[in-house]
Amino acid sequence: MTLGSGSSVVVPRNFRLLEELERGEKGIGDGTVSYGMDDGDDIYMRSWTGTIIGPHNTVHEGRIYQLKLFCDKDYPEKPPTVRFHSRINMTCVNHDTGVVDSKKFGVLANWQRQYTMEDILTQLKKEMAASHNRKLVQPPEGTFF
């Protein structure tokens, strides 16, 4: 939204997170990506859980991946920390910790305020289907970092 003076209205962090929570609870697209609060008692809305169902025609097909997203006090000005809880082998994910490397994952590397947790999860799903990730040998299903 733009005002007549040329300045933009900045939606406060908590309102933004409430919007994201509502969208995440309603479901996204084809249902292969979802997210919600990790702890309903967290009044600062910092800890979130995401789920991605692996894309078709890849080694990830049919697998369910759980992720943790942490939105610090400076979100959405800065991106959340994203970590796979489920073990996965991807070029942008640290093999020891499951943390998504912001330098190797475009959405985090080029973060903009209007990006959302939904954008992160949908782009991670697309990254799973990318030629450099779609056939990588994966850890056994059901294993965690």
Swiss-Prot record:
Coiled coil: none
CDD domains per record: UEV_UBE2V
The organism's place on the tree of life at top rank: Eukaryota
Disulphide linkage map: none
Signals that turn on the gene: Not induced by stresses.
Tissue: Expressed in roots, shoots, leaves, stems and flowers, but not in pollen.
Gene Ontology cellular-component terms listed: cytosol; endoplasmic reticulum; UBC13-MMS2 complex
UBC core domain boundaries: 12-145
GO biological process, one term: positive regulation of protein polyubiquitination
InterPro entries attached to this UniProt entry: UBQ-conjugat_E2_core (IPR000608), UBQ-conjugating_enzyme/RWD (IPR016135)
Subunit structure: Heterodimer with UBC35 or UBC36.
Assigned protein family: Belongs to the ubiquitin-conjugating enzyme family.
Biological function: Has no ubiquitin ligase activity on its own. The heterodimer with UBC catalyzes the synthesis of non-canonical poly-ubiquitin chains that are linked through 'Lys-63'. This type of poly-ubiquitination does not lead to protein degradation by the proteasome. Mediates transcriptional activation of target genes. May play a role in the control of progress through the cell cycle and differentiation. May play a role in the error-free DNA repair pathway and contributes to the survival of cells after DNA damage.
Protein name: Ubiquitin-conjugating enzyme E2 variant 1C
Gene: UEV1C
